[in-house]
């Protein structure tokens, strides 16, 4: 199985952080591609995990979301307020250390999107 296929399989299951992290950080898979796969499978947790890891292809992601008739995801990706989560180490390759690091992980960018949705909704984006 090639790396992109492995990444695609990893992104099918929502909240599959350990496998996505390992594919992107340890094996060198493209984090933006992981975000695109997650958009295709409508896995919001994975989408925001990818953003936390540094995915930044928001325009392409919005286009893909619209193609998949996912206006909610496209609206979330339209917010211009996301950034990489510096608390996630991008150098760790030991699966046990990664597992411990991600044990209590909560996406800072998903929290931002959630607060925006609660306060303003996504209709005006």
UniProtKB/Swiss-Prot annotation:
- Write down what this protein is called: Protein MGF 360-9L
Question: What InterPro entries does its record include?
Answer: ASFV_MGF360 (IPR002595)
Query: What does UniProt give as the signal peptide span?
Result: none
Where it mainly occurs, coarsely classed, is host cell
Instruction: Explain the induction of this protein.
Output: Expressed in the early phase of the viral replicative cycle.
Please name the Pfam families in this protein's record. ASFV_360
Subunit and interaction comment: Interacts with host STAT1; this interaction mediates STAT1 degradation through apoptosis. Interacts with host STAT2; this interaction mediates STAT2 degradation through the proteasome.
Transmembrane segment boundaries? none
